[in-house]
């Protein structure tokens, strides 16, 4: 099988970003103790990262859109590396939060520009699969990077987890340098024209679907460690094992979502959002024993990431005149859902409803996303392809 080196380089970058984004979720109790805050307060570090992605996605994309894509992507990974180093040496909670925000500024633009690059190096009928290949690095991070970072945090200290992740940033920069063509600087974007594209009702509807889909995921995933500790009475070793299993589910779902979205974006969204809603409603009952927890985490992981490629392609297709900006803003929308999901889960916990209600809240959000897809499906084109420019 011929290796597509640009896609491989993008997947390596996605692996690093996935590790730094998701590893704190398995380390919330450890980080909370380390900076002397509550678990819900530590959860706000995840929300802060998500807010940084929202701000950084359009800002960094517009600032770098006239640069050669290789240079832009390497610069974004340099920000990633610096942010993780600063997180590792942060002396207190507020400094750690600011460091996480800095780290997050690369996220949306990397995946946004990366999605356009991925779609441009394959035939049009394989664009969703190409985007899924890049996101495979994100899912593989949950199999290897996140559990390894969790283990480092539990055994050596959470600071070492961030430092090791910074090392991934260096590897990513090297791989991007040698794998992507140098290219030349592009024309400066027509900001008003591209922003006008984003204001279209069908684009806004697609972005809102992304917010709700991601919100459903992060309502539970942000607090996955204490949820498993509460419902399953899980040990740290079992939590780590479940993170690996969730990562396997992510990878399977990402692959299936990309393949099926090549056939039907809306159909793929409907099917997997329904599955996501059902499995989250079942988790409080299934996860009462370790076998049920393992089954539910694997299915939940698959359903969660199966919606990612179609969500990304949906926005890129309805905003094909501004593929880079729309793709980046969609990543920002994903992380707005991240922030809202973390806040929703934290609100459930703070209200005293118990950790068992956290996945139920996630199911409610998934139901809203599914409803929106049904309402807007007739207006969403299935045949528009992403511009390769």
UniProtKB/Swiss-Prot annotation:
Q: Where does this chain mainly localize?
A: membrane
Membrane-topology descriptor = Multi-pass membrane protein
Transmembrane annotation, as ranges: 7-27, 44-64, 71-91, 101-121, 131-151, 160-180, 204-224, 237-257, 267-287, 291-311, 331-351, 357-377
GO molecular-function annotation terms?
transmembrane transporter activity
> In this UniProt entry, which residues form the Periplasmic topological domain(s)?
28-43, 92-100, 152-159, 225-236, 288-290, 352-356
User: Which top-rank group of organisms is this from?
Assistant: Bacteria
Question: Does this entry carry the keyword Secreted?
Answer: no
Q: In this UniProt entry, which residues form the Cytoplasmic topological domain(s)?
A: 1-6, 65-70, 122-130, 181-203, 258-266, 312-330, 378-389
Full protein name? Inner membrane transport protein YdhP
